[in-house]
Structure formats: C-alpha cells, structure tokens
Amino acid sequence: MPYIFAFFCTGFLGAVVGANFPNNIQIGGLFPNQQSQEHAAFRFALSQLTEPPKLLPQIDIVNISDSFEMTYRFCSQFSKGVYAIFGFYERRTVNMLTSFCGALHVCFITPSFPVDTSNQFVLQLRPELQEALISIIDHYKWQTFVYIYDADRGLSVLQRVLDTAAEKNWQVTAVNILTTTEEGYRMLFQDLEKKKERLVVVDCESERLNAILGQIVKLEKNGIGYHYILANLGFMDIDLNKFKESGANVTGFQLVNYTDTIPARIMQQWRTSDSRDHTRVDWKRPKYTSALTYDGVKVMAEAFQSLRRQRIDISRRGNAGDCLANPAVPWGQGIDIQRALQQVRFEGLTGNVQFNEKGRRTNYTLHVIEMKHDGIRKIGYWNEDDKFVPAATDAQAGGDNSSVQNRTYIVTTILEDPYVMLKKNANQFEGNDRYEGYCVELAAEIAKHVGYSYRLEIVSDGKYGARDPDTKAWNGMVGELVYGRADVAVAPLTITLVREEVIDFSKPFMSLGISIMIKKPQKSKPGVFSFLDPLAYEIWMCIVFAYIGVSVVLFLVSRFSPYEWHSEEFEEGRDQTTSDQSNEFGIFNSLWFSLGAFMQQGCDISPRSLSGRIVGGVWWFFTLIIISSYTANLAAFLTVERMVSPIESAEDLAKQTEIAYGTLEAGSTKEFFRRSKIAVFEKMWTYMKSAEPSVFVRTTEEGMIRVRKSKGKYAYLLESTMNEYIEQRKPCDTMKVGGNLDSKGYGIATPKGSALRNPVNLAVLKLNEQGLLDKLKNKWWYDKGECGSGGGDSKDKTSALSLSNVAGVFYILIGGLGLAMLVALIEFCYKSRSESKRMKGFCLIPQQSINEAIRTSTLPRNSGAGASGGGGSGENGRVVSQDFPKSMQSIPCMSHSSGMPLGATGL
C-alpha cells in the first residue's frame, strides 16, 4: 500500500510540474490571403524554430477590412485557447481589435501600419516613419510640396507632417487618393503641373504605391526636375526602372538590409525552402512586410522561451471564456505574456527588434535610399538618436562595415560612489563630461575599444534592477535594457541568474562578494593590568597551580631523598664530633626557589639530589617556554590599540537580535538571501523580511547613513567593493567585518540578442589582460582614499607606550614595597613581643636558680660541657650559648627574698 501511495504521489506531482508550462503553445493567425507572401513567411518562420516550446498555428483567412468577420474570427481563436494572435488589420478594424485585446488581455502581434494607441496588448512590429520622413524633408530643405496619402493607413504620419509644417512655415498640399480613379490621377497631376508642384511625398502601402507610380509614368511626370519621397519602408520592393530611365529623383526608406549577415543567411534558407513547401510564392526577395512577419514569429518564440526559462505558469485551464461576455473577463496569464513579448530583443531580418512600454518598435535603423539617373545608392541612415546621418558622415565613422557604429548608444548607469559621480563643477560641463568615476572611465575605454559613440544616462528610479513579484515588471537599469530604453548598462550591476534570463552580461570586470558593514567600535582603553593580556586567564591560573605544585613536589622530594640531607658546619671551637643532618629545602625555601626560577633570578640554594635537580630542570624548561611566549606577545599587546567588534561573521548576526541588519531594497543582495537554501542565510532572510521597522534601504548611501547613526545597532549587507570604498571615506567610522558571504562579479549588461554583446565582452577581456581594470580600482579606491594608508583596512593601530599601558606594573611595585614595609613592621613587633615575654619569664626565676647559674657560669669550660647538659643545640645543629644576653645584664631584676635589685648585690 505505501508503494502504491508513493507511486500515486509521484505521478501527481509530475503532472503538476509538467502542467506549469505547456510543451505546445497554440498561436492564432489572421491573414487576408492564403497565397500571400506574408502567410508563407509565417509558415517558414515556424518551421525554423527548434527550441521548445513548440508553436502550433491556428490560421484563419479573413477579410481584414470587415469588422464583423474580424470579430468572429478573433473570438473563435480566443475560444480555442490561443496564447497570442498574429495578424493584420486595416483602418476600419483596428479599433475593434485593440478593444478586444485590451478587454481580454490577449496579445495581438501585427506588421500592419502603426497606430497611436495606449493599448499595451497590441505589439506593433512596423517602425514608425513620421520622424524619419520629417528629417528627410528637412534635409532636402523643402518648403513647398504635395503630400499624397492613403486614408486606409491612418492619418498619424500626415498629422505629424502638418504639425511640423506649421512650426517651420512649410506649404503643404495634402491629397487623399483613397477613392481616386485613373481620371482622377490625371486631373491631379495636371493641376500640380499648373502650380509647378514637382516635390511630392507619397504615403501609401506598397500595392497602392505601385499603382500611383504607374500613373505617374503613364502621365510622364517622372522626368528630370521631379522629386518623389516615398513614405514606405520597402524601397527595394518597388519597381522604379521607369523612373531611372526618365531621370526623376526618387528617395525612400529601406527597413531590411539584405547585405547584412543575418538577412543573407535567412534569405538563403528562404530560397531553399521554395521548392519544397510554397511553390506558388515569389521567393526572389521577401517584402518588408514578410520580413516583419518572420520577425513577429521569432518574437513570440523568444517570449515563450523566456517564460519557460523563468518557470512562469501560463497554462490555460478549463474553458477559455466568452469573448463577447459583458463585462469582459480578462485572461489571467495575458499580462505575463504581454510583458514577455515587450522584453524580447534580438537581431532579426528587420535589424534590431525591440519594443518600448507601449508595444512600439524602438532603437531601429532605417536606410535612406536615393535613385537618380545614374542608379540607386544609399545616401545615409536614420535612427532615433542621431536622426538623419548622411553617407559622408557615415563613411567617416566607418561606413557600413559594422552596424555597431551606425548610431549613438544609450549607456544607462547609476549614481554610486566611486563608480559614477557628478563632478563638483558639473554645471560647467555637458553630456558625459559631467560625470567621473570608475564606471565613467570604464565606459569610455569600452567605447574606444568597440568603436561606438555613446551617451550616459542616469537611471530614473535609482535602482539596479529587480523583478516585482506581483506585476512581474523589471525596474532599475535591468528594466531600462529589457524595455528598450537603453542599449548598455555600465554600472556595479551584479551578474545573477534571474537577470541573465532577460539580459546578457559580459565577463566580470570586478569580482566581489556580499560583506557586512558595521559602525567602527571605539578603541578599547588599555587596562591597568594589560600586561597580563598576552596570556589568557586560564593560563595564568595554570601557572599559579604549577608553581604551587612544583614547590610542594620539590619539598617532598628533598625530604625523601637521602642525598638532600647534609651535615651543618660547626663554628670554630665547637665540638665537631657530633654530626647533625640538615635540609635546606623546607616548604618556604621550596616556594622561594620556584619563584626565583620563574622570575629568572635564581637564589642561593640549589637541589643536591638527582630527583630534586630533575624537578628544578623541568621547572626551568617550563618557565623558559612560558616566559619566551609571554615576552613575544607582550610588545604587540602593549603597543597596539585593539577594537573589540561585536560582530565577526554572518553566524554572529543570525544568532542575535540586538543588532538589526538589512540589505538594499531592490538588488542582487536581497535576491541572494531570498533564494538561499543555507540555514544561516534562511534564518537571516526570515528576520529581515519580518523586521519592524523595515531593515531594507532604498540606496547604499541610505544604508551607510543608517549604520553611522544607529550607534552600532544596525549592520548593512552590501557588496564588498562598496564596503571597502566607504571604509576609506571620511569620517572613517565604518568597517568591514568577516569574510565574504558569496562570490560573484559585476558585468556590463546588454539586452538579449544585442549586437554589442560580443564586442563588449572582448573589450572587457582585453582591458583585464592589460591590467587597466586593476589600475582603475586602485585609483578610485585607495589613491583617493581619505583615511590614510591602511587606515580603513586595519582594526589595530600601533602606537608608543603610554603610562596607562604599564600602570599595573608600577602598582605592583608600589604594592610590593608597601607590603614589604608592612611585613617588616609586623616582624619587628612580633619579635619585640616575643623577646619581651621571654625576658619577663627569665626575671621570675628564683634567686637560688640564679645564683646556681652564676656559679656554673664561672666554672671553667670543658669538653664535656655540652654533653653534661650545660649547653644545647638549636635548629639546624647550631649551638646555643648559656651566657646571659647582654640585654639582660642591664635589666634590674628584683629578688624575691630581699626585694632588692640584683644589681645592688654587687654581683
């Protein structure tokens, strides 16, 4: 039974995990003609996809100008559970489509003409032409011209031209040719000829444009003196042979550069697929709308692959819902798909493919082509940053050799010392010259090696880049790259997995790790007995016990060993026949010997026996090692001011609650703790996310200020490089403690699929090999440091000895001298009292005993006096004289019998 249950659970979990992201993605397609080149390009692009998930098309052929039919087909595909719809629209159906997409949260990817809409669920593949057209008109200095347009494309381009005309005093004649017949064309150009209007802008789709040009040729309005600007992105798709022969000047725009590597490779695959799949389609050269269709399929593929890598669940469960329900029920996963589509960036058939937050193309390049009687040539290019760049300037900058050099790139960065800082006199400079710092110089070196021009822009929200867990949107510099507002990020941007899924990184230009910043603790004042610090308290206790133990062992060994006993030398005149044995190592002498040896001073006595000398030898060896070790450490402990840090590691932070700690609110450090599976870091993350007040800060500067003002009650977790830099800045009151918690690196970021990735990567490697990266770090970290050499790196500072360092030694000296005086006084008092008691007892001896003693003392001494009891031996065999002390001779003793002093007897 347990095995069955385990098998069931395993199968269930597998089903759930597998359902998180489908292997097959249904996508819709709305095409006006099954035999169109766009339809063939759609199929061809699907056949080129190899990475999962697999895109399965649901294609409907529809009249794109019929609102009812478009509504029916759109709702039909939505009910089938498609994840996104690719298709075309016209002026009559565009509003209906955008309304449905916004209400149902279904993404619609289209190569049709751009429309001005705030609906973020409509992704417009075709670049806008308004600004490019105005730049070309301005380049030719046209003041009076005719604007022929097709109302089916909308009026956005015309409106922008008329607004500019009002600003620049242009004379513009606008003509709508939506319903113009052949006779109408004839009358139109006859009227223009009368007014001598020979400068004409034609704004039409390719099919209608070919018809208009045919009428121009038929009416012979294509001779010398006529100049036509074609507001169309497919200049090479149009047959202009008649114009070339007659001498008219024709200028236009070309979106697809067929000589580039990627279009050339795809074109080769395009041609080889002709004979197998789509024999009735002209494959000589795809139209720009077909190229947009191909890129549109790749946009969807890239988006779903990104969602799959990020493990975002977009599975459609149950019924897809009613398209015409009132109110409309939006699809829950639609917003995730919409964000993924907008974040896509790659080099496709139409160049750099990326979108802004409104779903419109951005950072694209249009090639400006001109045809005269001598042939077709490229006269320049246009992009959003540089506007129109003539071919001469293009050639000076390197021509068409590299697409990297064709525009000014936006380099996003963040104000963070010492990476990017405003100069003190920044208001006196413009552009990139306003900034200084490590990353400013690095960006300049990268641009010099790659060979492109750039403009530094500070990220508006002041964040590095993190993904909002609710909206799934990216902020900071990562968001700038993801949403196409910047081309490169040169900043202290950490390389992480979640960021690598949406942007590309170069090789690391700096290695680092997460570290702990705390307020530098006050230097501990040396204690009175700091000379005891070289040895631990336990060692001092062991030394005391060893001293006592050695003294006791020496005393016992000396008592037991017969070789420690010896005869005392007698005074001259004494009887030397008596041999009394003595031992110099009593308990006090043993203590004195051990103390003298420990102090390396010695004493007047030494062991005589082998056992005693063994005890003395091992004690001398012990004291030699202890004293040498103590002396070696004493200098360092007395001359170094030490700082006691309350925190030394992440473990210390995790196991206490008195000191708060936090990270940057949006950054890789916070993401590291959130994703970590290490017990210590999980515990720290649990504390940080639930701490009140919040321990997270918006900027590194805010974290630094909080550390300084919290009086040691807040620790800030940040990258080690920034920690080391702040430690070198005044007021020099922060410090880095412990080692790094992880190992990672800073990298230069580019959008996914950017052409800059490889050149930038090679430039970083070259700068590293040249040693320039190390030079830059030394320059901005240490050469410009404000805390002195090593001032911020060392927790200890060597200085001269002061009285406070050795005060304890003087205290012990003074105490010892005082103790000696006190003991001497006690000894004197004790001896005086003892003598007084002894003399008092002597004076009370009976008169007869005194007389007898006197008589005895007058007798001549003989050799047997000592043996007969007239003398005695004292301690250690010394003979005690029986004569009265001199002091006693002057003491008046009273006789018991007569009451007279002894001195009065005349004795």
Curated annotation (Swiss-Prot):
Residues 1-18 form the signal peptide. The keyword Ribonucleoprotein does not apply. L-glutamate binds at P492, T494, R499, S668, T669, E719. It is a multi-pass membrane protein. InterPro entries: ANF_lig-bd_rcpt (IPR001828), Glu/Gly-bd (IPR019594), Iono_Glu_rcpt_met (IPR001508), Ionotropic_Glu_rcpt (IPR015683), Iontro_rcpt_C (IPR001320), Peripla_BP_I (IPR028082). Phosphorylated at Ser-645. Phosphorylated at Ser-710 by PKC. Phosphorylated at Ser-849 by PKC, PKA and CAMK2. Phosphorylated at Ser-863 by PKC, PKA and PRKG2. Phosphorylation of Ser-863 is reduced by induction of long-term depression and increased by induction of long-term potentiation. The M4 transmembrane segment mediates tetramerization and is required for cell surface expression. Homotetramer or heterotetramer of pore-forming glutamate receptor subunits; heteromeric assembly can be the result of both receptor subtype and flip-flop forms and according the composition, one partner can be dominant with respect to the fast desensitizing current component, whereas the other can determine the steady-state component. Tetramers may be formed by the dimerization of dimers. Found in a complex with GRIA2, GRIA3, GRIA4, CNIH2, CNIH3, CACNG2, CACNG3, CACNG4, CACNG5, CACNG7 and CACNG8. Interacts with HIP1 and RASGRF2. Interacts with SYNDIG1 and GRIA2. Ionotropic glutamate receptor that functions as a ligand-gated cation channel, gated by L-glutamate and glutamatergic agonists such as alpha-amino-3-hydroxy-5-methyl-4-isoxazolepropionic acid (AMPA), quisqualic acid, and kainic acid. L-glutamate acts as an excitatory neurotransmitter at many synapses in the central nervous system. This is Glutamate receptor 1. It comes from Rattus norvegicus. The lineage of its organism: Eukaryota, Metazoa, Chordata, Craniata, Vertebrata. The gene is Gria1.
